[in-house]
Each structure stands twice: as structure tokens, then as C-alpha cells.
From Swiss-Prot:
GO terms for cellular component: cytosol. Disulfide bonds: none annotated. It catalyses: apo-[ACP] + CoA = holo-[ACP] + adenosine 3',5'-bisphosphate + H(+). This is Holo-[acyl-carrier-protein] synthase. The keyword Magnesium applies. Its EC number is 2.7.8.7. Mg(2+) binds at residues 8, 60. It is found in: Cytoplasm. GO terms for molecular function: holo-[acyl-carrier-protein] synthase activity; magnesium ion binding. Transfers the 4'-phosphopantetheine moiety from coenzyme A to a Ser of acyl-carrier-protein. Keywords: Cytoplasm, Fatty acid biosynthesis, Fatty acid metabolism, Lipid biosynthesis, Lipid metabolism, Magnesium, Metal-binding, Transferase. The gene is acpS. Its cofactor is Mg(2+). The lineage of its organism: Bacteria, Pseudomonadati, Pseudomonadota, Alphaproteobacteria, Rickettsiales.
Length: 123
């Protein structure tokens, strides 16, 4: 049973500008250690910015699907987006008692990144 659907679009240069302005402080506030470490596979700032923009969009889409937004119960850095060995994007949330499965799709083109997520319960 579907319990929520979320979508978010991020302007990649916005993420790059925030990263340049606030550096590691921005990264640590928004992204998990795993996401930051995973960005090291990209050699260019643009590649890293695309990586971070897709993950930013995924976090926003996730809380939209939940219908809660961010707050005391869930922070951006509590959410980790990663890819399986076959490249499928996955999402996990630490400190969460929510038992939903997530189907996540990420994409980017030119200056935009997008995330689409469906949360569902196992029947």
C-alpha cells in the first residue's frame, strides 16, 4: 500500500554556491558521512555538486512523501542516499521507527537534479 509520494527538483549551481560559501560546515549539516565519503569518487567540483544535489533532492522528496518536513524528529543528515552495486539508488534513515519501503529514482541534466520517491508498506 502506498503511503506517500514525493518529488523535488534542485538547481545544481545553488548547491555548488552553498558548498563554496560554507564549505564542510554545509556538507556536514546536510549530508551523512557516507554521502560525503561517496562524493570522493568524483574528481571535479561539478561532479561532486551533481552528487550532492541529487542527494539533497532525495532528502526533500522523502520528507514530502512522509508529510512531515524537517524538524526535531528528522534532520537532513539523518537521511542517507546510496547506490547498490548495480547502481540502484536507495535511502535509509537513522533514528527512525518508520517501517516503510522506499522506491527512489534520481536523475540530473544540465543545471537540475531531480528525485522521485514512493513510500509503501509491505502488505
Amino acid at each position: 500500500m502506498i503511503v506517500g509520494i514525493g518529488i523535488d527538483v534542485v538547481y545544481i549551481p545553488r548547491i555548488l554556491n552553498l558548498w563554496k560559501k560554507f564549505g564542510n560546515k554545509f556538507l556536514k549539516k546536510v549530508f551523512s558521512q557516507e554521502e560525503i565519503k561517496d562524493s570522493n569518487k568524483y574528481t571535479s567540483c561539478e561532479g561532486k555538486a551533481r552528487h550532492f544535489a541529487k542527494r539533497f533532492a532525495a532528502k526533500e522528496a522523502y520528507v514530502k512523501a512522509l508529510g512531515t518536513g524537517f524538524g526535531k524528529s528528522i534532520k537532513m543528515s539523518d537521511i542517507t542516499t546510496y547506490n547498490t552495486l548495480h547502481g540502484k539508488p536507495q535511502i535509509t534513515v537513522k533514528k527512525s521507527n518508520i517501517d516503510y519501503k522506499a522506491e527512489l529514482s534520481l536523475s540530473d541534466d544540465t543545471d537540475y537534479a531531480i528525485a522521485f520517491i514512493i513510500l509503501h508498506k509491505e502488505s
